[in-house]
């Protein structure tokens, strides 16, 4: 396997192939096949997202994949932002369609033509819905599994509110939801206010959740958008307030994608393979029976341990594959990122114990089956240590710069600097180091002199990005 530090790009591609997460050999570039193990992980991520939004009174929906051209063109700024990425359907069978149809690049245009039918009075608000679907974008840049693809596994939440203040409260709720999701995935991140030229098309402002990959490049792993009344005015989404006056709703959205899985792979993995957070590991503990004279009894004992683990809601399996040595199985499951390995031989059976090996630090611990509940604690500790390691990696590769001439030129890092917010100064940094402005750090009132022009600026982040 490639060395992660020396060649992250090759390591990343190789581990996706070895762990059988997806197969990129499908006939259409950028439309990859989800393989069983990768899909199981993604479904567990989806479950975390669902649990968090369901707890905040969101309702799940499912909209059609096709959108008419007129639906898309209702909001000019929105369609302008996607016009070069849209897949168009122009024929039905052998007949040319009278109305061109698009595969959804996102679902504002589809949903907001329905909102006026659902929203009539203040009693219908807030409206909070979401869906987890595929969206389609004709990506012309270099495609990369889970990072830049043409068919995107996508979560999108959409809300409508009585006024801007209530929409802003929703934005705060999104951040609480995101914090919980990121904690479960053990991911570090900054919250960056995107510059106006990089905000979501049609939004008043965009907040992005950006993490740092081991390559030194930034990866956007989530966004929330405040729309105000921009979309409501174009799609005529109005309601009668408590006084009987007709008003436009204010709207927000929240988007996440399979890039969450990309971040988990890249940030947590090592030269042995994946290291999965326990929260999304399809197998949290793998039981490896050790062959010997009493192997049938060892298998029976392993089955007993499996039942005990399932009783405490640990996702566990027994690797009873024949013609494979224990050593091969150890390496195979380590490569797949399973948090804990449980070795069971005649010695463990005779002493009513199990030997537990951590994927993260390789430490071995022999515990009595009376202490089997400790497996849950070990999984929690696994995730805590993953989180600490991930935040440490990002912090160690974040550099504060107060002079444009001090930008490190020999490696990619996350650059923190004061910036006035102008496009000119952002372009100057890009020419110097080939970095782009991720935006100003959200909710920080820290101010200083812009690293380029010396005018007043706010603390901001810059990086090469995927």
UniProtKB/Swiss-Prot annotation:
Family annotation (Gene3D superfamilies): Anticodon-binding domain, Bira Bifunctional Protein, Domain 2, C-terminal domain of ProRS
Alphabetical list of SUPFAM superfamilies matching this protein: C-terminal domain of ProRS (SSF64586), Class II aaRS ABD-related (SSF52954), Class II aaRS and biotin synthetases (SSF55681)
Statement: the UniProt record of this protein carries the keyword Translocase: no
Catalytic activity annotation: tRNA(Pro) + L-proline + ATP = L-prolyl-tRNA(Pro) + AMP + diphosphate
Pfam families reported in the protein's UniProt record: HGTP_anticodon (PF03129), ProRS-C_1 (PF09180), tRNA-synt_2b (PF00587)
GO biological process: prolyl-tRNA aminoacylation
Listed EC numbers: 6.1.1.15
An example Gene Ontology molecular-function term: ATP binding
Chief subcellular location: cytoplasm
Class of enzymatic activity (EC top level): ligase
Keywords: Aminoacyl-tRNA synthetase, ATP-binding, Cytoplasm, Ligase, Nucleotide-binding, Protein biosynthesis
GO cellular component terms, semicolon-separated: aminoacyl-tRNA synthetase multienzyme complex; cytoplasm
Subcellular location: Cytoplasm
Protein family according to the UniProt entry: Belongs to the class-II aminoacyl-tRNA synthetase family. ProS type 3 subfamily.
Annotated domain remarks: Consists of three domains: the N-terminal catalytic domain, the anticodon-binding domain and the C-terminal extension.
HAMAP family noted in UniProt: Pro_tRNA_synth_type3
Subunit structure: Homodimer.
Stated role: Catalyzes the attachment of proline to tRNA(Pro) in a two-step reaction: proline is first activated by ATP to form Pro-AMP and then transferred to the acceptor end of tRNA(Pro).
Name of this protein: Proline--tRNA ligase
Organism of provenance: Picrophilus torridus (strain ATCC 700027 / DSM 9790 / JCM 10055 / NBRC 100828 / KAW 2/3)
